[in-house]
A protein has these predicted regions:
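Short acidic, glycine/serine/threonine-rich loops at helix termini
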Residues: 12-15, 44-48, 120-123, 139-140, ...
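A short beta-strand element within the Helicase C-terminal
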Residues: 108-111, 115-142, 156-160
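Generic alpha-helical propensity signal that fires on short helical segments
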Residues: 17-21, 48-53, 124, 142-147, ...
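Conserved C-terminal RecA-like helicase domain
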Residues: 2-111
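Conserved nucleotide-binding/hydrolysis micro-motifs of P-loop NTPases
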Residues: 6-8, 38-42, 115-117, 132-135, ...
């Protein structure tokens, strides 16, 4: 689930978490996680650029770091791990999260920019997008799900909460 900012990631994460806590269904709760490196630059978000991944958590605001710490604590409780937002702990969280996503142990991953480029997990089948994307970033993000995976997955799904039609046409035309 790609979102436009750390604040949006927090809102979605807390909403899903609260829905799971208040659910009266007999089905197992969704396993939801989040990761981000720093708040997206408003100008870059407006035009749809995807920032490079960074493991420098010192660039995060204190509220972003506090939220990420809480989300990592939830993850630690779920998977019986002991990660943190310090530099090595964050990199190890990233690696373990990638492993859990590839193993289909995470039902929903909320990201701002991380995991949208360069991450390969062919079994992923749906990308929800609530952020502006364009050109290379759009093609890279959409490609995360649009990969064939044996006979069970012949295509991926993209669900957008923003109007990305012209950006998609422009990206396909360019590439």
């Amino acid at each position: 689930f790609a979102v436009s900012s750390v604040d949006a990631a927090k809102l979605y994460y807390e909403c899903f978490r609260d829905q799971q806590k208040n659910s009266q269904t007999t089905q197992r709760p969704l396993k939801v996680a989040t990761i981000f490196s720093f708040a997206a630059n408003e100008e870059q978000d407006a035009v749809g650029d995807i920032q490079d991944e960074s493991f420098d958590v010192s660039a995060m605001s204190s509220s972003a770091k506090e939220f990420l710490s809480a989300a990592i604590a939830d993850y630690n409780a779920l998977f019986k791990t002991n990660f943190s937002v310090d530099s090595n702990g964050f990199q190890n969280y990233y690696r373990d999260l990638a492993k859990q996503v590839k193993a289909k142990e995470i039902d929903l991953l909320i990201v701002v920019g991380m995991f949208l480029t360069g991450f390969d997990a062919p079994m992923l089948n749906t990308l929800f997008v609530d952020k502006n994307l364009r050109y290379h970033g759009l093609m890279q993000a959409f490609s995360r799900t649009n990969r064939i995976f044996d006979a069970t997955k012949t295509f991926g799904n993209i669900v957008t909460f923003r109007d990305l039609e012209q950006a998609t046409i422009d990206a396909i035309t360019l590439f």
